[in-house]
């Protein structure tokens, strides 16, 4: 690693933007050398220390396709087949663009900080709200912190709800609320994972698990064939259409942790196209599985937000359930780790080197997540509500606006650490795309999507109530009559 760094430093680079960008890469590489303690190979480093472009790709792809694999067929039943496919592609590409914007702003922020203040981030994890603060000021910091933390909080809640929903299809002797208690305790162990730098083996395994599950859903649906009397009537209601659309918006809005993943890389500038590459792979999982399950079961999915509930119990389904449970533990860690960082910084413990002490101070973060998962156990509808109210701003509107404002002056554009991508030759083109995203997501995602998602969410509360003991469970068998009991 040190030899690679020396080779990079020997290259004469012209232009302030390239020098600043190279400083970002070199300082990140130095941090990794310090953390690994040399060039010697060890199994611990191989499994535990991940900062390559491949590590970032696995992290992005693994984090993007968690429990949404199981709710996308439900969204297809609300949208119809054609809209479901087209919106996946559209929001996937839009999400890749805003992830690119976030990566550009991270490089810009870090280059400016290291150039102006000679600031070292050796023991400090840069987060999205700090990027906004450094580039645009305290009001943007407050907005980024509020939206990002709330989204990640509910993202963690969704993983707990999904754990309880999935395990119920293997063991229904316990209700879903009890399973939520159990998995809340299990997921609390993520406090021992220091940062995204240490998710190497977990990201690799997590993507393998979702790949198995996606192809299980696809193959099992085709082998099952179409259910008797199946109908495909979607879309039938505007409220259902926009609810399904915002669930897909949520699916491809998993880059609330982009900055933390970039910071864990040895060369953060390489992140620019990684999210797009991850999204293209995710398409190979989400499009076939959602289409196949919807083809097989049609409108039945409107009352079954978890695709596992309609497939017959087999050892292959049980395997998929178990793998998804493990993956949801990993995704819980992905969503919660930035919250751990924020909490550590708030109480002045972020630079503590003791792993056990950091784990201890992180535990209070898990408690409200646990509590909210018990209050709102609505697997499926909660995804759409979070997508409409939080993802719209966190990963679409705020990054697009922040990019436009950061480079609003000619001098900022001239000295930018990253120029527009090769396929957009001018800054005007970048501004047009960003403005389109802001208007589209604000009107259709937040406006119509928020109305539809909250209408559906409130309907779930009215039907099942808060603290529902077993959301969408089969009703218990009728009790045996007293007279029949005496005759036995």
UniProtKB/Swiss-Prot annotation:
InterPro entries: AA_transpt_TM. Residues 1-64, 106-141, 200-202, 260-273, 342-362, 406-427 are cytoplasmic. GO terms for molecular function: auxin influx transmembrane transporter activity; symporter activity. The chain crosses the membrane at residues 65-82, 85-105, 142-162, 179-199, 203-223, 239-259, 274-294, 321-341, 363-383, 385-405, 428-448. Belongs to the amino acid/polyamine transporter 2 family. Amino acid/auxin permease (AAAP) (TC 2.A.18.1) subfamily. The lineage of its organism: Eukaryota, Viridiplantae, Streptophyta, Embryophyta, Tracheophyta. GO terms for cellular component: plasma membrane. Residues 1-36 are annotated as: Disordered. PANTHER family: OS05G0424000 PROTEIN-RELATED. It is found in: Cell membrane. GO terms for biological process: amino acid transport; auxin-activated signaling pathway; root cap development. Pfam families: Aa_trans (PF01490). Residues 83-84, 163-178, 224-238, 295-320, 384, 449-488 are extracellular. Carrier protein involved in proton-driven auxin influx. Mediates the formation of auxin gradient from developing leaves (site of auxin biosynthesis) to tips by contributing to the loading of auxin in vascular tissues and facilitating acropetal (base to tip) auxin transport within inner tissues of the root apex, and basipetal (tip to base) auxin transport within outer tissues of the root apex. This is Auxin transporter-like protein 1. Its main location: membrane. Keywords: Amino-acid transport, Auxin signaling pathway, Cell membrane, Glycoprotein, Membrane, Symport, Transmembrane, Transmembrane helix, Transport. The gene is LAX1. It is a multi-pass membrane protein. Glycans are attached at residue 303. It comes from the Eukaryota.
């Amino acid at each position: 690693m040190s030899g690679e760094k020396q080779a990079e430093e020997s290259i004469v680079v012209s232009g302030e933007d390239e020098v600043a960008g190279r400083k970002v890469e070199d300082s990140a590489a130095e941090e990794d050398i310090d953390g690994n303690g040399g060039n010697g190979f060890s199994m611990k480093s191989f499994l535990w220390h991940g900062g390559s472009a491949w590590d970032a790709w696995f992290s992005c792809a693994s984090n993007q396709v968690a429990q949404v694999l199981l709710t996308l067929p439900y969204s297809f039943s609300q949208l119809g087949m054609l809209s479901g496919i087209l919106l996946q592609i559209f929001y996937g590409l839009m999400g890749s663009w805003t992830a690119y914007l976030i990566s550009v702003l991270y490089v810009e922020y870090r280059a400016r900080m290291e150039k102006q203040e000679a600031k070292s981030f050796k023991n400090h994890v840069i987060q999205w709200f700090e990027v906004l603060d450094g580039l645009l000021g305290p009001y943007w910091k407050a907005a980024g912190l509020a939206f990002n933390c709330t989204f990640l909080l509910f993202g963690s809640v969704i993983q707990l709800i999904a754990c309880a929903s999935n395990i119920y299809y293997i063991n229904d002797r316990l209700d879903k609320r009890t399973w939520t208690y159990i998995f809340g305790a299990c997921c609390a162990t993520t406090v021992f994972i220091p940062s995204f730098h240490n998710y190497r083996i977990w990201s690799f395994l997590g993507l393998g698990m979702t790949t198995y599950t996606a192809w299980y859903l696809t193959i099992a649906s085709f082998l099952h064939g179409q259910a008797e009397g199946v109908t495909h009537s979607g879309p039938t209601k505007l409220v259902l259409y926009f609810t399904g659309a915002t669930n897909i918006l949520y699916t491809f809005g998993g880059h609330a942790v982009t900055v933390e993943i970039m910071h864990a890389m040895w060369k953060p500038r390489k992140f620019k196209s990684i999210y797009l590459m991850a999204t293209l792979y995710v398409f190979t999982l989400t499009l076939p599985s959602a289409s196949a399950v919807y083809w097989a079961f049609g409108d039945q999915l409107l009352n079954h937000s978890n695709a596992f509930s309609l497939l017959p119990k087999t050892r292959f389904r049980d395997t998929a359930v178990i793998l998804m449970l493990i993956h949801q533990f990993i995704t819980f860690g992905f969503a919660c780790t930035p919250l751990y960082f924020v909490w550590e910084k708030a109480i002045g413990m972020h630079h503590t080197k003791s792993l056990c002490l950091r784990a201890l101070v992180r535990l209070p973060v898990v408690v409200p997540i646990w509590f909210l998962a018990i209050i709102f156990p609505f697997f499926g509808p909660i995804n759409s509500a979070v997508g409409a109210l939080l993802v719209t701003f966190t990963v679409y509107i705020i990054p697009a606006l922040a990019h436009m404002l950061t480079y609003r002056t000619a001098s900022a554009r001239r000295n930018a650490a990253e120029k527009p991508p090769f396929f957009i030759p001018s800054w005007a083109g970048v501004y047009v795309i960003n403005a389109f995203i802001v208007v589209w997501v604000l009107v259709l995602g937040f406006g119509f999507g928020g109305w539809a998602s909250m209408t559906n969410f409130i309907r779930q509360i009215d039907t099942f109530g808060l603290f529902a003991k077993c959301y969408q469970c089969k009703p218990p068998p009728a009790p045996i009559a007293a007279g029949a009991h005496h005759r036995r």
